Amino acid sequence: MARAGSCGGAAAGAGRPEPWELSLEEVLKAYEQPLNEEQAWAVCFQGCRGLRGSPGRRLRDTGDLLLRGDGSVGAREPEAAEPATMVVPLASSEAQTVQSLGFAIYRALDWGLDESEERELSPQLERLIDLMANNDSEDSGCGAADEGYGGPEEEEEAEGVPRSVRTFAQAMRLCAARLTDPRGAQAHYQAVCRALFVETLELRAFLARVREAKEMLQKLREDEPHLETPRAELDSLGHTDWARLWVQLMRELRRGVKLKKVQEQEFNPLPTEFQLTPFEMLMQDIRARNYKLRKVMVDGDIPPRVKKDAHELILDFIRSRPPLKQVSERRLRPLPPKQRSLHEKILEEIKQERRLRPVRGEGWAARGFGSLPCILNACSGDAKSTSCINLSVTDAGGSAQRPRPRVLLKAPTLAEMEEMNTSEEEESPCGEVTLKRDRSFSEHDLAQLRSEVASGLQSATHPPGGTEPPRPRAGSAHVWRPGSRDQGTCPASVSDPSHPLLSNRGSSGDRPEASMTPDAKHLWLEFSHPVESLALTVEEVMDVRRVLVKAEMEKFLQNKELFSSLKKGKICCCCRAKFPLFSWPPSCLFCKRAVCTSCSIKMKMPSKKFGHIPVYTLGFESPQRVSAAKTAPIQRRDIFQSLQGPQWQSVEEAFPHIYSHGCVLKDVCSECTSFVADVVRSSRKSVDVLNTTPRRSRQTQSLYIPNTRTLDFK
């Protein structure tokens, strides 16, 4: 069994773990005062309960009684006993052990008093100690008496007041008899011993902190020389005073301080409660809110703010407000008109249909309709390659007028209209006018127009009698009049004053139909509209080129290795040169295939979307590596040398309104370069021809194109 330190507060001050048992002498030295009566009753009861198992144990002094943390009391082992202050004969019976326990409790009650002083005890406690300490005299007196006579002793024992206490059971019975409920004596006295043990440890820890604080203050003094004070002097400095104050504080906390008045309960004669320490009792009351706050008086009265709780104040405020109207009686104000944002206005304008320009009069209805807005191909001797159709010439051989069917065309986009308006505003009255085709007019629409015109020509041979054709709408169909440089190569319908159509325009609103020659019908049936002859955009050329490249790639399907290399971009699409492993070759803009630097050329185009760039505005940078690429094929060198002219490099000057936002350079392979160059040449020639068309024929645009009366092919 471990021993506790002999010096009070040494364990707590030295930082060692708290002991789990203390001797009665250590408790007395810590408090510097004797035990109270309640603690004496508890030590007697718990001591008898702990010593029942060893009746021959000898208690020589208060140091032999040990108090444990659970409230039990035991005796110290004989071999660990210290030198006794009073010599006691060896105990050989339970009666002598009870007697030694009585002497120890008496010394604990009389500890610290002078010999001349005597402590006043309660009659019950004084009688118990007297019976325990004088049991040997009672024993000897009983032996001298007559053995056969035991009447008075039996009478006293029958009355419940024994003449001597010789056993532990008798002492425990007397300790329990003083309580109102003797059955709870064990729990009560165990709680008292536990409280005594815990309070002693707290007092020792408090005294250790006081001693450390004093030592700290002495070290902080700089004006006085540092003098080493003996440890005993520091320990004894104010020890008694601090211990007395501690005991008074514990007594006040246990008896006098109450946060809330306890309701009346059953009468309990116990003066104090020892189940918990004062600190534990205070914390338990705070947690359980067993307290009642005093009301604060202001001018002799409680303020109105604290008369009611918050919930009642809120309800009073709600009741004080005017009553709410019923839902059926409420009328909400109309919402103010919401102002539309600029974004919403723009979206509404986009969703609305385009407004057509009104027809100015019947004089405009009598005008002829020009040719379709298509692009002329390079003029050749074959009439099949001609793509310009003159729709303004009347049929001279027609004897009667016939109705002209109308074809619905798609309206141009907003971007196209802006480009056309911008180009018309920047032109001078005498300068050439750059025309742009309606990109929404596709080949399917042209084929449909061709079929309707052909059907109209067939029905014109037997026109109904007396029928008058409907008046045509003035629109954007242009009358094409070629210049002097194109008259020998390109077909045209020249406005002649002697022409019957032109002579009858000013006099009558009807336009007689002209007869169609068999050659014209034959040429119209064999009319073709090649891709390169259209004023395509870059996006349309890219789509066409991708379809052609996809068809060209099908011939490499038999050679899977070559097909895979071309598809994955491991070799050049033109010269079939293999690229290095960690290289990043450029890709062609049109066919999206990898191309080497010797087979590519830089193409110049405006900084716009591909769908808004006409193909005739493209240009090429002069290749600097034509002379260095000696291994290049002759056909590729010819392509590069054919792009040396100034017409490919001065596109910014030729089309300033399109290149106003700058230009970009794109890589194009040699195969796509030859394809695009042919398309650009054809488009530029057609644009040059369309520039000679008078401006008055392009004043307005119509979504309807009437059927032609004469098709002139040469």
Curated annotation (Swiss-Prot):
Disulfide bonds: none
GO cellular component: cell cortex; cleavage furrow; cytoplasmic vesicle membrane; cytoskeleton; cytosol
Localisation: Cytoplasm, Cytoskeleton; Cytoplasm, Cytosol; Cell membrane; Cytoplasmic vesicle membrane
Positions of region (Spir-box): 534-554
Keywords carried by this UniProt record: Actin-binding, Cell membrane, Cytoplasm, Cytoplasmic vesicle, Cytoskeleton, Membrane, Phosphoprotein, Protein transport, Repeat, Transport
Stored SUPFAM superfamilies: FYVE/PHD zinc finger (SSF57903)
Domain WH2: 248-262, 278-296, 342-359
Polar residues bias (residue ranges): 486-496
InterPro entries xref list: KIND_dom, Spire, Znf_FYVE_PHD
Homology family: Belongs to the spire family.
Stated name of the protein: Protein spire homolog 2
Source organism per UniProt: Homo sapiens
